[in-house]
Each structure stands twice: as structure tokens, then as C-alpha cells.
Amino acid sequence: MGADRRRTPRFRVYHPVRLHRLRPTQLVETLTKDLSFGGVRCMSTATFPISTELQLELVLFAGEEPLTLAGHTVWFQVVPYGEQYELGIAFDEVSAHHKRRLSIYLDTLSRQLASSSV
């Protein structure tokens, strides 16, 4: 993975996410491991090489419409002793509506974290 080039804080959260590979078509349903304004880390039973274009459907709250985001893999690694991969996915295109929803959600997490450490 190399040096940490993250520009925004990440939060350890576990949310359902669907990864749609555009070419060739493939669908993986999994969970996030962490989330930031710029991307997500998740697990996958399928490998997605670096620069694979993906469409993500990310559910932040049960019963809410998922965020639909375009992204691409920036790294992947094999999970030791398993048949899974960890994926790092950077968001490419986020609508203004979904940016607002993601920003509100991450701000809430940040405030909760700050208040719990006092």
C-alpha cells in the first residue's frame, strides 16, 4: 500500500456495500471496513485489479436509499489464510446530493468520536 496519502479522516464502520464492476460485468455484495469522504475499504471474495472502474451502492442507514458512487480500486491485498481480498476504492464521481449525505454522516461520526474521547 505504501505511504498513507489520505486527505480526509477515515472512520471504522461496517455498512452493506454492493460493488458493480463495469467491464466485465460482476457484482459483489460485502461490508465496508472503513469509510472517508474520499473512499472506502472493504472485503471481497473477488479480486479487482488496480484501476478497476466500479459503481458502489453504499447503505449508511437501514431503510434509506443507498448512495450510488463511481470509483476505482487504488490498492488490493490478499487476506492471509483466507480466500478474500481487502480493497481500497477511491470515489471518482459523487453527486451533490450524495456529497451532502456523506458529509453529514461523517460529520456526525466525527462529533460522536470527539464527545466519547472527552
Task: Annotate each predicted stretch with a short phrase.
Residues P16-R21, T52-P66:
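Short conserved beta-strand and strand-loop elements enriched in small hydrophobics
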Residues V40-S44, Q55-L58:
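Short, well-ordered beta-strand segments in soluble/periplasmic domains
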